[in-house]
Amino acid sequence: MDLILLQKVTNLGNLGDKVSVKPGYGRNFLVPQGKAVPATAANVEAFETKRAEYEAKASSILADAQSRATKFEGASVTICAHASTEGKLYGSVGPRDIAEAFTAAGLPLEKSEVILGEGAFRNVGEYDVVLHLHADVETTVKVIVESDA
């Protein structure tokens, strides 16, 4: 399935690129999310007439992500969870918990923006977490997991 990208998509391409993807990925994800349109002659022509508008929108989204990244620089959050005396958590701290903690601290964050390379945290400690705010913008924050007992 050939598509024209309306914004930058990680590991796929940039704005205006004509890409070929599997039909399910295009039909079920890229097109409904407004990230791409089918590469028909009419859509190619319509895209070229609105290219400046799409580029302006993409640059404003990037600027918003960069301003959000500056707010997160040096930020840290403490999450209290039930833990054993050895420091092992009863359960885990995952992306949803981290996003909720930052949102409660006044820094809005979606769980899909939290990248945990090694999975959820299962021990008490201090962790560096990568936030993927945009295809071009990533920042690192500190998450401290403490025992609530």
Curated annotation (Swiss-Prot):
Protein source organism: Xanthomonas oryzae pv. oryzae (strain KACC10331 / KXO85)
Purpose of the protein: Binds to the 23S rRNA.
Key words of the record: Ribonucleoprotein, Ribosomal protein, RNA-binding, rRNA-binding
GO MF, one annotated term: structural constituent of ribosome
Descriptive protein name: Large ribosomal subunit protein bL9
SUPFAM superfamilies: L9 N-domain-like (SSF55658), Ribosomal protein L9 C-domain (SSF55653)
Pfam families according to UniProt: Ribosomal_L9_C (PF03948), Ribosomal_L9_N (PF01281)
InterPro entries reported for this sequence: Ribosomal_bL9 (IPR000244), Ribosomal_bL9/RNase_H1_N (IPR009027), Ribosomal_bL9_bac/chp (IPR020594), Ribosomal_bL9_C (IPR020069), Ribosomal_bL9_C_sf (IPR036791), Ribosomal_bL9_N (IPR020070), Ribosomal_bL9_N_sf (IPR036935)
Family: Belongs to the bacterial ribosomal protein bL9 family.
Superkingdom of the organism of origin: Bacteria
Encoding gene, per UniProt annotation: rplI
PANTHER family given in the database record: 50S RIBOSOMAL PROTEIN L9
One BP annotation, GO: translation
Taxonomic lineage: Bacteria, Pseudomonadati, Pseudomonadota, Gammaproteobacteria, Lysobacterales
GO cellular component assignments: ribonucleoprotein complex; ribosome
